Amino acid sequence: MAKPGRTPAKGAGTSARILHDGLVIASHGRHCLVETPTGERLICHPRGKKSQAVVGDRVRWQASEDEGTIEEVVPRRNLFYRQDEIRTKSFAANLDHVLILIAAEPEFSEHQLARALIAAEAERITPIIALNKSDLAEPFERAWNKLAPYRRMHHGVLPLSLKASGEADYASLMKLLAGKSTLVLGPSGAGKSTLINLLVPGATALTGEISQALNSGKHTTTSTTWYWVDEARTTSLIDSPGFQEFGLNHIAPMQLAGLMPDIAEHANDCKFYNCTHLHEPGCGVIANVDAPGKPGPISATRYRIYGELFAELSQSRY
């Protein structure tokens, strides 16, 4: 694999009218590291102030002396967002899977998990939940039981013990990920670095090379990086450090129920067509929420998360 930023890609210095195909594998600010179909890499800059390419974008770029200009972003299959207190920003595109890695310890946030699943559902990306640290018997059992609503929603939950049974976990993961582009997400302490290095030996060194090529200094928590798992470049991982709040502001409040499978299953049973599932009489969702003395298929925690997100999305529009 070519060293990033060391070898100019073929076509550099040729006619400016020629456009070349490329894949964005990393970005920092307005600098993108683009890989050509032959595996060479070069720095490119998007054309125009508002133009922005993200990791996973297929682009068409124009050569200059030693860098390039991204002239076109090929239409995306999907786009993933993150948000902070100030804004929502896209950060990865053209994904087949989102692998959400959580652990038996420390205890994971079901709210963050729900946000990630909703973001994936909105873009029609297949989510995979992986629960690490299966060697910790009691914490793992608690976490596994906590995930029961997600298993009922047909979200596969893959048990892992990355430090205790890495070889077996490698085989299990590759059965799911082979031939796909997968965004890997997870909170601190879940074992995401261990997973990345299991599937991509030397990923730490590659990250350093990419950071150097982009002049971004030390690898930061906001950088997103594409790694090839195999030499044939058919299987890839996209690592986005941290477990940020996923941007949901592009989703209208009334769309939310349709993006939560357990809620959606009962949303058509409501008396009113425009039911918010929060307070209306004859609501099919409310009637199916689990409660003391009245078991139901929708967990009380999931319904609470729905209400919180509905309020958040309603507020963001004013």
Swiss-Prot record:
It holds the Pfam family RsgA_GTPase. Its EC number is 3.6.1.-. GO terms for molecular function: GTP binding; GTPase activity; metal ion binding; rRNA binding. The gene is rsgA. InterPro entries: G_CP_dom, NA-bd_OB-fold, P-loop_NTPase, Ribosome_biogen_GTPase_RsgA, RsgA_GTPase_dom, RsgA_N. CDD domains: S1_YloQ_GTPase, YjeQ_EngC. Binds 1 zinc ion per subunit. Monomer. Associates with 30S ribosomal subunit, binds 16S rRNA. Its cofactor is Zn(2+). Keywords: Cytoplasm, GTP-binding, Hydrolase, Metal-binding, Nucleotide-binding, Ribosome biogenesis, RNA-binding, rRNA-binding, Zinc. GTP binds at N132, K133, S134, D135, G186, P187, S188, G189, A190, G191, K192, S193, T194. Residues 82-246 form the CP-type G domain. Zn(2+) binds at C270, C275, H277, C283. This is Small ribosomal subunit biogenesis GTPase RsgA. It is found in: Cytoplasm. The keyword Nucleotide-binding applies. One of several proteins that assist in the late maturation steps of the functional core of the 30S ribosomal subunit. Helps release RbfA from mature subunits. May play a role in the assembly of ribosomal proteins into the subunit. Circularly permuted GTPase that catalyzes slow GTP hydrolysis, GTPase activity is stimulated by the 30S ribosomal subunit. The keyword Zinc applies. PANTHER family: SMALL RIBOSOMAL SUBUNIT BIOGENESIS GTPASE RSGA, SMALL RIBOSOMAL SUBUNIT BIOGENESIS GTPASE RSGA 1, MITOCHONDRIAL-RELATED. One of its GO terms (biological process) is ribosomal small subunit biogenesis. It comes from the Bacteria. Belongs to the TRAFAC class YlqF/YawG GTPase family. RsgA subfamily. GO terms for cellular component: cytoplasm.
